[in-house]
Amino acid sequence: MTTIRNHYQNNQERNNMSNMLEKARKYETEKIAATDPQTKPLFHVSAPTGWINDPNGFSFYDGQIHLFYQYHPYNREWGPMHWGHSVTCDMIHWEQLPAALAPDEEYDKAGCFSGSAIEADGKHVLVYTGVTRIKQPDGSEQYRQNQCIAFGDGK
């Protein structure tokens, strides 16, 4: 099943970002403000808070190297994966950007899992696996994986 996801195509849509993504970004901002910079690595990508998982979407876009990664911002244990976002020009000094993806749609509500990033038609395009849980007649749950596409503004 292919699902098209259309994030942040212009500034107007950016103002209408999902509640989950807005919540994650606000939480990141609060945690970053409360974190002593001396506790963070100088030359290594790290999440602003929570659990960090797989690197994804390593790409060159708009003159910078972008690295996305799965992470759960609300806990230091595994949970519904979001995509964090960092950029660099030299592969040594990394700048943390706001979260890029949050599990906020029916097709990815159990998490935004592994994927890639490319540039297409001047847009940064994220292709990832969205995961949902499907309740079975016997009461058990089964995971369904959906291929998703997010079109970003590169910020």
Feature locations, PLM:
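Beta-rich carbohydrate-recognition and catalytic domains
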Residues: Y8-K155
